[in-house]
Amino acid sequence: MTEQAARSAVIHTPFIELDKLLKRENLAATGGEAGLLIAADLIQVNGEIERRKRRKLYPGDRVVTDKDRLMVVAEQHQR
């Protein structure tokens, strides 16, 4: 099986909390479900299991689930 490329998760603020990102990107239906996924050690951030649901994610962070791979990126402003 080949490794899939990470898709971009654009944020419009300096950071986003992990549980909110999982909900926003439709990897969890609710905050409760996001918390369960995190508590079950099913989420990795930057290659390590993450157990903090409110972990702050910044541009450049990578999130991996069994369903998807995400790269957190900052919104690009047009000049």
Segments the model singles out, each with a brief description of its role:
Residues 13-59:
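A basic, amphipathic helix-loop patch mediating RNA/tRNA/ribosome contacts
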Residues 7-8, 59-79:
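A positively charged, amphipathic N-terminal helix/segment that binds anionic biomolecules
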Residues 2-16:
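A detector for short, charged/polar N-terminal pre-domain segments
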